[in-house]
Structure formats: C-alpha cells, structure tokens
C-alpha cells in the first residue's frame, strides 16, 4: 500500500512491512548498492517538471514562459538531462554546477548563472558558453561582466536581481522591511518609505479593448493634433520626473503613482540598470529578477512582489525608453515535507499570479 502522499507514487509498504521502491525492497537495494543510498524517482521528477512547465504556459498564455530547475536542490548529469528534456532551464550558482550541467550536454542557452560572489572564471565560462542569463547580484558586477565580455570579444546576456522589499515563506507572512537582504539590489534607496508603493493596490484594471482603443487613437493619422500632444507627454523621459502630470488634471491615484515611480527612479536598481544599458556593446539587458523566499503556499506574496517589478519595468521605460523583455518572478513554491503540510496548487496559484501581472500591466499601460 502507498506510504503517504508526500512519498513518490511508486513507493509502498509491502505485506511484510518492508518499504518498496518500484517493486524493489529497501533491503534488496541496500544489498546491491550499499548504504547510505539516495534514490531519485525519475518518473516523478519528469512528471512534476512537465506539470510546472505546462501550468506556467497555460497561466501566462499571452507571454513566452521559461521555468528553471534550481540546481542547488540536487544536481547530477542525469537530473539535468531529465528536467531539460521536460522543457526546463537549469539555474546554476557554482563552477561545479555549471560544469555538471554542461557535461550533461545541455547547451548554454538553457542555463542560468546566479550567485552573489561569482568568480571571474565562472563569469567567463558563462559568457563563452552563451548562457541564457547571468543574473547580476550587486552594483559593481555589471562593470566586471562587461570587462570580461570585452576581453572575450563577446556579448553577455544579463538580468538584474532586485530586492523588492517583500519576503515570504516558512512561518513568516509578507513583510516590507527586507531591503537589507544579502542578495540583490534594492528597489528603493536606503531610508525611503516603502509605503509609497502601496498605490499599486489601488490601480484599476482596464480591458484590453480599451487599451487598444487608446493606442489606436494616439497613433491614428486622422488624429494628428492628438497624436502630437500625447506623444510629447508619453515621451517625457526626464530622469527626475519620469511621469509628467503638469499639463492636465489628474487623480490622486495618478499622483501617488508618479511619486512611486520617482522613488524607484531614485533607487539603486534603476541606477544599476542604467550602468548595464551604458554597456550595451557587450551587455544585453534581458530583464529583472526577484526572489522573495521559500516554501510559499499561495500566490499572495508573489503578486505583491510582481506588482512592484511591473512598476520597475514601467519606470525604466519612462526614464530610459527601455522595456525589460523578461521578468523573473522567482521560486520558492511550497512542497509538503510532512503529512500535515500542503503543497502549493500550481495550476490555481500561477493563474492568480498571471491575472495580477496582466491586470497591472494593463493599468500601467505596458505590454505583457
């Protein structure tokens, strides 16, 4: 009979009381392979990987989605082959993990390099192998990556890890006081009041049809005067005042949104993104990344963080006319460790997250 839901489906207790794994008793496996013995149910790994990839694609059905396996969970060449064949990318954060993934025959374009203390050798290997992303984790890292890329005569694809001030997981609830995390670059400047970002909870969604109508009206040839007026307003990229409201009456929500964008524009993340953009000859800015915790049971904290990431994306568009093509919303989706715990319902919670991301982008007038 099955042991409990937290065990792989192919694990059972037989009539004699022995644990069986795919029909083999624990005793026979120990006799053959010795102890300690680690068993990986590859059928379970592949099924879960495919489920996550499919759930993400279905939830974010108007966008291209990539799901990554965290190498720190467990990494071997066979596991790398299994998860990449199931459609996943692989996150690495040490030279050893990088070499294991490459030795498995996976091309660099399916690999990501993370880490807050990368060596020059790790950065060089990621650039040489054409990694999908090198995730920038600290303010001085773009210049290091740029220098190595110039030496190699190559262009590196980079993404900035942002500390958005949201933390969740385990027994902790959402907190907005985690700008001192050791990973990533803060969204807001030290001492800034994170309450300025609360305006995101007041944004009103607009229907895609209304958004399209507004865009059509702005760019329609028969509305030349309107086009000129709106273009001047929408192309106002002043760094200090990224959201110009001086020429028309605006709502309190719009004023609060302008204040939030100004706070982000003055923050460390935008400053580092500007450094990356200043090195576009050797650095391709592909997006921004956040990670808010581990063992998170529902989408609420992810939604909170995602809204801030969407506003960062809007702010960079306003200050530098650059739309981040990719936003990585991080991992930490819960799995049950004991019989009394629940795993996150991936299908339900990813749909909630996707709906929040899409509605926020529509409210901000940004593409998906």
Residue ranges of each PLM-predicted region?
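Short beta-strand segments
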Residues: 70, 157-163, 289-291, 328-330
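Gly/Ser/Thr-enriched, mixed-charge loops and adjacent short helices
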Residues: 278-298
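C-terminal active-site-proximal or functional interface alpha/beta core segments in diverse enzymes
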Residues: 292-368
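Alpha-helix N-cap and loop-to-helix initiation/capping positions
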Residues: 118, 137-140, 178-187, 252, ...
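A charged N-terminal "starter" segment
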Residues: 1-157, 172, 178, 194-215, ...
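Structured alpha-helical segments in the cores of large, soluble enzyme domains
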Residues: 48, 101, 114, 120, ...
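Active-site-proximal loop/turn and secondary-structure-junction residues that shape catalytic pockets
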Residues: 73-75, 96, 117-119, 138-140, ...
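Acidic, His- and aromatic-enriched active-site or binding-groove loops in soluble protein domains
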Residues: 159-161, 179-193, 353
């Amino acid at each position: 009979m099955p042991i409990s839901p937290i065990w792989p489906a192919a694990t059972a207790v037989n009539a004699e009381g022995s644990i069986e794994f795919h029909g083999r008793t624990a005793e026979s496996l120990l006799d053959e392979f010795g102890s300690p013995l680690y068993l990986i149910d590859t059928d379970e790994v592949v099924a879960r990987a495919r489920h996550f990839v499919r759930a993400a694609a279905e939830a974010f059905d108007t966008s291209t989605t990539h799901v990554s396996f965290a190498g720190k969970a467990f990494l071997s060449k066979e596991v790398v082959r299994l998860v990449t064949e199931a459609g996943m990318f692989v996150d690495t954060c040490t030279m050893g993990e990088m070499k294991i993934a490459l030795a498995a025959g996976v091309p660099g374009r399916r690999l990501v390099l993370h880490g807050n203390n990368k060596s020059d050798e790790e950065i060089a290997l990621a650039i040489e192998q054409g990694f999908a992303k090198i995730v920038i984790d600290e303010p001085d890292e773009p210049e290091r990556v740029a220098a190595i890329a110039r030496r190699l005569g190559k262009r590196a694809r980079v993404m900035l890890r942002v500390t958005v001030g949201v933390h969740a997981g385990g027994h902790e609830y959402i907190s907005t006081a985690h700008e001192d995390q050791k990973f990533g670059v803060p969204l807001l400047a030290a001492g800034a009041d994170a309450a300025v970002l609360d305006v995101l909870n007041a944004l009103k969604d607009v229907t895609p049809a209304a958004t399209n109508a507004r865009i059509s009206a702005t760019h329609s040839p028969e509305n030349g005067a309107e086009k000129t007026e709106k273009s001047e307003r929408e192309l106002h990229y002043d760094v200090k005042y990224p959201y110009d409201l001086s020429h028309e009456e605006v709502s309190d929500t719009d004023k609060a949104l302008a204040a939030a964008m100004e706070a982000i524009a003055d923050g460390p993340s935008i400053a580092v993104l500007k450094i990356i953009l200043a090195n576009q000859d050797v650095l391709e800015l592909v997006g921004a990344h956040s990670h808010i915790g581990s063992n998170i049971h529902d989408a609420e904290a992810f939604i909170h963080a995602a809204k801030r990431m969407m506003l960062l994306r809007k702010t960079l568009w306003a200050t530098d006319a650059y739309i981040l093509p990719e936003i990585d919303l991080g991992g930490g989706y819960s799995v049950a460790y004991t019989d009394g715990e629940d795993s996150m319902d991936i299908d339900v919670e990813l749909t909630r997250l996707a709906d929040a991301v899409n509605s926020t982008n529509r409210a901000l007038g940004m593409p998906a």
